[in-house]
């Protein structure tokens, strides 16, 4: 299917996320450290291969006018969607040295023992390779910026960045072309200004069992705040 025909409509995208239970309500601490009453768990929609493929094709279609040599994603959230975007992109005249006919490579960067983002597992980029950085969700754009720095340190050239969801309200400024499939305006707060904290609601850190809340909050309250 041509990339231009792969673009999903907003209602189709929302339908996928909602049917997979990926849009959750409660009291959450995001990876940025901010708190929010809504969390989008992209892993829940990406666990379904046909959804992941369609989302990858649709996101790739936003960058169909660019010549790209590699897709780089920060682990863990960007792993699946990065692979699917790379799979959907035309191979073109790649500056890479991968196997002929293998397609655009999907590379991931991850945190090392010091907590710094790095390129490991034998991954590498050649000088001037044109890279698309792909993430699942943007809130502050911190992980994407870290991935961009790793690409540049490896000699690559970041030409664009993409995400499934931009929950920043368009505030993300990355210094390159940046596009998301869905723009969702979801309020988020520093912990000291969080109205949910002021109410004494327990906060959940998605992706882990770590729950932190008022001393009076029992395990039942903590479970409730995970949301629907």
Where are these regions (language model features)?
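PRPP-associated nucleotide enzymes
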Residues: 1-228
């Amino acid at each position: 299917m041509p990339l231009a025909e792969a673009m999903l409509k907003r209602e189709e995208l929302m339908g996928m996320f909602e049917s997979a239970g990926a849009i959750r309500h409660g009291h959450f601490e995001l990876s940025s450290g901010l708190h929010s009453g809504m969390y989008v768990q992209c892993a829940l929609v990406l666990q379904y291969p046909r959804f992941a493929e369609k989302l990858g094709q649709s996101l790739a279609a936003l960058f169909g006018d660019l010549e790209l040599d590699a897709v780089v994603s920060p682990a863990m959230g960007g792993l699946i969607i990065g692979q699917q975007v790379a799979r959907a992109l035309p191979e073109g005249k790649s500056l890479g040295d991968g196997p002929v006919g293998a397609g655009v490579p999907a590379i991931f960067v991850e945190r090392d023992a010091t907590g710094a983002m790095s390129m490991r597992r034998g991954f590498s980029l050649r000088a001037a390779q044109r890279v698309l950085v792909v993430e699942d969700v943007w809130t502050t754009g911190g992980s994407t910026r870290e991935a961009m720095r790793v690409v540049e340190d490896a000699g690559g050239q970041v030409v664009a960045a993409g995400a499934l969801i931009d929950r920043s309200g368009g505030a993300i400024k990355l210094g390159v072309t940046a596009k998301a499939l869905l723009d969702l305006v979801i309020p988020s707060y520093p912990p000291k200004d969080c109205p949910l904290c002021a109410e004494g609601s327990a906060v959940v850190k998605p992706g882990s069992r770590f729950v932190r809340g008022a001393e009076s909050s029992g395990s039942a309250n903590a479970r409730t705040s995970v949301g629907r």
